């Protein structure tokens, strides 16, 4: 009898502790009060526009950039909204303002340090390697240091202390690292040379996350890479007459997409390591690759043209893209219906594609672990219906 009772108590305790462990491993629902963003053009809401020489403004300073939603150029590298904009809409927050160049703007509900052309690794690294990366010197570490410098000011304008403010924020870490690969690829470096950068890039992203955790960050969304083998720029740069070099379903270049997967696998491994070190922090992996690649696999299912590899805005060649005659330059045309296209300017994607990606990340299955929206009211969650699926 005593033995049976002992077994029963032991079983109960095991079940009890298992329940606690499982519950603690699942992300709790949070009502985020702000978005803090780092990265490159994938998330840049206007920083590069303000950092540029006024006599040599970037292409995103001109129409048709911004025409679909904002009706004017905002510095976003798309015809309209980006993933970060759709995340802000879903959370009921204002669009995240760029830090650089903003005047009389409140950063209490968000601030964005992402800059077009930015790298995860510092500019000095590329100079030493003989790789040109002269779009900007605002690398991930520079963005983070800028954030640290202004953090006391951000906290002073809020009723919350600094750790509480970061704890209530969704911290978007990019995409970061894409340009670290773009520059050497466009200088015709070998793929083995470029692969050597991956551990360094992953470490730079990881170090930034750890710094932000030390400051009080509790929720991170860490994007992986894009399937660049489907971008008009890469398809043009590495165009070949060999049919076997292309994916028969999508028309993309598999070897380039495999490189993106190589990066993502290492990033996911590092995120798993960080989760073990910081079990109280929710570090979500955003699968940008598959969230976008599905659109290339079944374009008509998602409202896009069949085989939508050509850029909407551009000129020349099979993919409507020519280096030196890109979107935003005088005389370069653009399509009448950007919502039917995935590729926008050869490097970036359209608002319609961003919208589909954002839906897949916020509502699954492209965030790991998935967001928990159980504490939001039904009306808030219903807002996702505007994303499409």
From Swiss-Prot:
One Gene Ontology cellular component: extracellular region
Primary location group: secreted
Pfam short name (any one): Lipase_GDSL
Source superkingdom: Eukaryota
EC numbers, comma separated: 3.1.1.49
Compartments where located: Secreted
One of the record's GO molecular function terms: sinapine esterase activity
Keywords assigned by UniProt, alphabetized: Glycoprotein, Hydrolase, Secreted, Signal
Modes of activity regulation: Inhibited by PMSF.
Region forming the signal peptide: 1-25
PANTHER family, A to Z: GENOME ASSEMBLY, CHROMOSOME: A07, ZINC FINGER FYVE DOMAIN CONTAINING PROTEIN
Other comments on record: Overexpression in seeds induces a strong decrease of sinapine levels together with an increase of choline. Seeds display higher weight, size and water content and a fraction of seeds display morphological alterations, characterized by large cavities near the embryonic tissue. Seed quality parameters, such as fiber and glucosinolate levels, and agronomically important traits, such as oil and protein contents, differ only slightly, except that amounts of hemicellulose and cellulose are higher. Seedlings are larger and young seedlings exhibit longer hypocotyls.
Role description: Sinapine esterase that catalyzes that hydrolysis of sinapine, releasing choline and sinapate. Sinapine (O-sinapoylcholine) is the predominant phenolic compound in a complex group of sinapate esters in seeds of oilseed rape (B.napus). Sinapine has antinutritive activity and prevents the use of seed protein for food and feed. Shows broad substrate specificity towards various other choline esters, including phosphatidylcholine.
Protein name in UniProt: Sinapine esterase
Species of provenance: Brassica napus
